């Protein structure tokens, strides 16, 4: 999003002051929504931040502290408003791993009770993967996750210093992970949803980490998507701000993501059917990567314009193992 010039901001502030003085601030101007996107090392992850002119609210922390610090630096270059809170949309590492950076600034962290409760288990699972399997980190270099400071259940309204409000909604369905918060900018109806939506971008198909196991819930993901239009009711121009990809109007974003998930599941089902007796190879660490790559190729072929096809290869194991589970019982 293009940043206004200082001259324009000054004019807007003067206008807002006049309005506040003559109309008792009943028509306060909306703040500004910004998006920071990490580099490839951070998986091209979006963090959305909202500046109401008096304070900044950040949604999702990024994967490692160095990238979170780059986010903070970007914010501080663009506004003098202090960062006062960081909201976690769901329990995935790129949403909570770098909370420490924001806590050091005095910002308060917020997540649903369910998301906060899930974080330790997800952290243990991912820490083991990145240190012991991927060997991309050591125990010392992998982010030390700090606890969420404030929790809520169901819904919560946050009144900003400007008088504007943000609404938090805990979806009834699990969504992309085991629990999902949607942050609504109440002035505009824009919805910030983390990886629940990746418009024009491939999805993360691992599922939530539950009891130490990847547990995708495609029906629950689609059900979560169906909840979004009602949250933006009365705001026909509202967009969905997902964890990666582009930002589309709510109806379009929901339809596109739902169609993608349906196709992804169909591709996996078809591949497993053709694989036949070789399905056991999907449980063999030495052989499964070839199959994951083949599924990635099929899904990438179905969506040739979508970015980040590698996300499929990294994450589809969760969906594959879920599909295989009934046959193994």
Q: Locations of the language-model features?
A:
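Divalent-metal (often Zn2+) His-rich catalytic cores of metallo-beta-lactamase-fold enzymes
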Residues: 190, 219-283
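C-terminal regulatory/interaction regions
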Residues: 274-329
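Active-site metal-binding motif and surrounding structural segment of the metallo-beta-lactamase
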Residues: 55, 66-111, 235-236
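Conserved beta-strand hairpin/beta-sheet module of binuclear metal-dependent hydrolase folds
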Residues: 31-77, 181-195
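Gram-negative bacterial Sec-dependent N-terminal signal peptides
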Residues: 1-29
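Metallo-beta-lactamase
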Residues: 116-172, 177-179, 187, 223-233
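Active-site-proximal loop/helix segments of hydrolase catalytic cores
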Residues: 165-232, 248, 256-259
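Active-site neighborhood of phospho(di)ester-bond hydrolases with catalytic His/Asp-centered motifs
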Residues: 59-61, 84-92, 110-113, 191-195, ...
